[in-house]
From Swiss-Prot:
Gene: Mstn
Protein name in the entry: Growth/differentiation factor 8
Role: Acts specifically as a negative regulator of skeletal muscle growth.
Glycosylation positions in this chain: N72
Keywords: Cleavage on pair of basic residues, Cytokine, Disulfide bond, Glycoprotein, Growth factor, Heparin-binding, Secreted, Signal
Lineage: Eukaryota, Metazoa, Chordata, Craniata, Vertebrata
InterPro entries listed in its UniProt record: Cystine-knot_cytokine, TGF-b_C, TGF-b_propeptide, TGF-beta-rel, TGFb_CS
Length: 376
């Protein structure tokens, strides 16, 4: 007769045989599949975050530049409008698109709207200039509102002088148009200078007009335009005021530099990852924004820049560095939605672009590069 303990053993063995072979790797495979599925979900989440970040950047740029829509300027128009002048070439050639300054200093710029540094203004037509003596004259400049509310540091009028065949002395005169006086006077002098030119190519000449510009800003009604003359010894005018064939980009223009004082704020620290990272915590990932891919030809430089974005989890176990958020959760765990992975430090980019008035602006746009991410 079989005793009870032995009978239990037989029953257990019978159940094992009936159940079939046991796969000892089943649990590990299940765990691997769960982990793989989690990584795929993380990749999809990051892809959605990248797309959202790019769309947000487009909206932010227009908003920070105070543009309702992207300026509609064709590539042909850009080639004609871009002056072939030293200050613009210098901006493009020595262009500091962005710098990785996430480790220097403890303060950062966090103002919202773009801080303008240089504005290049092209001349426009004026009814007053057309009526002066029955034919067009140059030049009339309209000024962006950015200039009126910022401190003018420098204002230069740039004019291009055509090449000469023999050495000559050139007398340059800049006249400001005024309302006709009783004696018929319609002009008053701004600047005059004498320079020697040698045979060869034409040259760019700059003239300080800061005082005149400041007066125009104080009394906009006094801005009726200017007339430019550059006469050689034979009375020939060498100044390019209305470019002819082969003279595209040689228009006179104003280069105005302004300054603004941005606000400052404190910084913190965060994790850096790449697209192949398996890090689940809140982290900064690389992202390059290509303006040419948008069809935004109105942005002269940069054509692309590194924007970066934040993605990852913000579990409360990671919150040793964020005690205020942790305390809120402890006080009301059901009512707290938890922290989000978000930029904790951002830096500006410099941008050279056309605004809606076909003026060339060189400015600094704040908070366009994610330098660090964190949970908050």
């Amino acid at each position: 007769m079989i005793q009870k303990p032995q009978m239990y053993v037989y029953i257990y063995l019978f159940v094992l045989i009936a159940a079939g072979p046991v796969d000892l790797n089943e649990d590990s495979e299940r765990e691997a599949n769960v982990e793989k599925e989690g990584l795929c979900n993380a990749c999809a989440w990051r892809q959605n975050t990248r797309y959202s970040r790019i769309e947000a950047i487009k909206i932010q740029i227009l908003s920070k530049l105070r543009l309702e829509t992207a300026p509609n300027i064709s590539k042909d128009a850009i080639r004609q409008l871009l002056p072939r002048a030293p200050p613009l070439r210098e901006l493009i050639d020595q262009y500091d698109v962005q710098r990785d300054d996430s480790s220097d200093g403890s303060l950062e710029d966090d103002d919202y709207h773009a801080t303008t540094e240089t504005i290049i203004t092209m001349p426009t037509e004026s009814d007053f200039l057309m009526q002066a003596d029955g034919k067009p004259k140059c030049c009339f400049f309209k000024f962006s509102s950015k200039i009126q509310y910022n401190k003018v540091v420098k204002a230069q009028l740039w004019i291009y002088l055509r090449a000469v065949k023999t050495p000559t002395t050139v007398f340059v005169q800049i006249l400001r148009l005024i309302k006709p006086m009783k004696d018929g006077t319609r002009y008053t002098g701004i600047r005059s200078l004498k320079l020697d030119m040698s045979p060869g190519t034409g040259i760019w000449q700059s003239i300080d007009v800061k005082t005149v510009l400041q007066n125009w800003l104080k009394q906009p009604e006094s801005n009726l335009g200017i007339e430019i003359k550059a006469l050689d010894e034979n009375g020939h005018d060498l100044a390019v005021t209305f470019p002819g064939p082969g003279e595209d980009g040689l228009n006179p223009f104003l280069e105005v530099k302004v300054t603004d004082t941005p606000k400052r704020s404190r910084r913190d620290f965060g994790l850096d990852c790449d697209e192949h990272s398996t890090e689940s915590r809140c982290c900064r990932y690389p992202l390059t924004v290509d303006f040419e891919a948008f069809g935004w030809d109105w942005i002269i430089a940069p054509k692309r820049y590194k924007a970066n974005y934040c993605s990852g989890e913000c579990e409360f176990v990671f919150l040793q560095k964020y005690p205020h958020t942790h305390l809120v959760h402890q006080a009301n765990p059901r009512g707290s939605a938890g922290p989000c992975c978000t930029p904790t430090k951002m830096s500006p980019i410099n941008m050279l672009y056309f605004n809606g008035k076909e003026q060339i602006i060189y400015g600094k746009i704040p908070a366009m590069v994610v330098d660090r991410c964190g949970c908050s």
